[in-house]
Amino acid sequence: MVVGIGAWGPGFSDWPTLKTLLRDGVSDTPLTVANPAPQIIPANERRRAPLPVKIAVEVSWQALQQSGLAASDVACVFGSGLGDTEITDYMCRVLTTELKQLSPTKFHNSVHNAAAGYWTISSGCMKSANSIAAYHQTAGLALLEGISQCVLQQEPVLITLFDTEAHATYRQIFPCEQSFGAAILVQPMTAQPINAQSKEAKPIVLTLSNEQPAVAQVELADPYLASLAATNPAAGILGLLSLLAQSPSAQPACTSLGIGPARAISLTVEHRQ
């Protein structure tokens, strides 16, 4: 079941705000939001952390706080379809110069599991930390990995997805123009939510199919959110989040996410009164 959710993107800096947007649509006001500055990262490290890391840690911290669980007891799965294209561009350009002198800080932040490293060190996480990259299949594979681990290991798992606006050099192949991050914290159905804020905990049923399932992806009515979901790999989770945003009186609803050629997972959200 889902016991914590975090979110950040243009027009929203937390789950309650995104929840309203998913229910009511995007307003006509400019969709802006300040870059996150997760206080859980020490100040010196926070100044050096790139935007993808800040987004990932911010939404992870939001979900953890909502759950009431201790970070040391929660395993984590981080997923980013693009990685940090700003640093990728920087490293490629520097390596074409005669001296090839890379910034140690940028090189340190260039690894794909940088966000997981910042999170585990800053939060005190003592459980496993995985990082996944699969372009537009990233959201589906991260959810498959995290939910499977939750069920098989009978432990809570934080699933964090994040992707930032692609650097202009890569825009023709990665048409991602908006940054987005979201995290959901799942725990086994046998466990009881320990935080009053988690009284809206919602069970999720996951089904693996060898072919594209009969269940279609949830269509987002709002054009802005639909575009975000189509172009930002991490935002592929918006269909699932739209189901989680529904009122407790809503009927069980399904969505699907691709995890590879002719292969997908189906997710069913069951709301409790």
Which positions does each model-derived feature cover?
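Conserved "HGTGT" condensation-loop signature of ketosynthase/thiolase-family condensing enzymes
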Residues: 1-107, 111-112, 116-128, 162-273
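Nucleic-acid nuclease catalytic cores
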Residues: 158-160
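Active-site-proximal alpha-helical scaffold in enzymes
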Residues: 56-61, 66, 133-156
